[in-house]
Amino acid sequence: LDGSNPNLKIIEIEVEEKATGEISAGAGFGTSGSTFGFGIRENNYLGQGIKVNTNLTFSNNSVKGELSMNNPNFKNSNNSLSTSISSTSSDFLADYGYKSNLSSLSLGTNFERYEDLFFYPSIDINYEKLETTPKASTNLKKQEGDYFETAFIYTLNYDKRNQRFQPTEGF
């Protein structure tokens, strides 16, 4: 199409968005029982490239749930922000004499500290409660109680690629 000036042209571009989400389900069985899992994942939540993932797994003696999110460009800073929360409840009181509840929270980010040197700090917080009965092993009885753990994790990454997706130069 011609523009308002002979040197200008109007270009019309039609963009068709592809599906960015997934739904998954699975089931299995074995000598220790059966398992059923269900998950939902979205790779472009709110059209901003935010990845959201949730999973729920059931087995004969346990239930596990997790919700995680990764924002690759948090507040337009070119720094990512990732969070995850999960909980696992296992009940083996009848067979092995113990019951465990574990809750976890994780928070992390990444940013370029110096040219091509990236810093990835994160903090993980875990709380576990272990209950036993006289049927439990001696080692499990010694571990009975509440545990709180905090871990600071970091990674340094030196990246000389010319681009992250399909690089043609660098390492």
Give short role names for the model-derived ranges:
Residues L1-F171:
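Gram-negative/organellar outer-membrane beta-barrel architecture
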